[in-house]
Amino acid sequence: MVKKEDSEYMPTKRLETLVDGIFAIAMTLLVLGLAVPQINGSLSNTIILDSYYNLIPNFFALVLSFLLLAVFWNSHHRIFNQIKKIDNTLLWINVIWLLFIIIVPFSASSLGQYGSYILPNVIFNVNMMGIGIFLYLNTYYAVSKNFIKEETTQFKKRKRVSIGFIFISLLALLFSFTFTSWSSTLYILLIPLNLVARRLDSFF
């Protein structure tokens, strides 16, 4: 007979399988924002080259979003390596997190198509901020409920990176209103953020 306490928890494997599936779909859908341009009239190498040149913002949005999704997937994987079980609250934290993940193809496509305007940048950066917040809530809630096998160095690093990413996305959101076309480039700060988080391991 299953104990009532045990029935309130779920193995992490089922959630991780769902996460893998959602990420596979979201990362694949990104390419839909990069359609082959339709050219009316006569064709020439110059005209075709110009049409592809106009796709650079779309290509940038695709690559940026793909790499960010890869970072999120890897962070979630590393975090859940140390989580031994989940309850209903942690499950729904992840479900809402996945909702933000599946919106990325839309926000990335909007950014690529209308990146010089404020609203698409706001949508993309709010999308990123939501992902960062709920990724951090995973670690915060799991630690508070003692769901962690061991708070390893890697786990602590992921917590720091999640917090840092929230601030980067907030900064990018603020840039949306001033340096609109450049706001999304701030996510390059993830590179030094990871290096700093790694260095902090020797102090904490």
Q: Can you annotate each of these PLM segments?
A:
Residues 2-204:
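Multi-pass alpha-helical transmembrane bundle typical of ion/small-solute transporters
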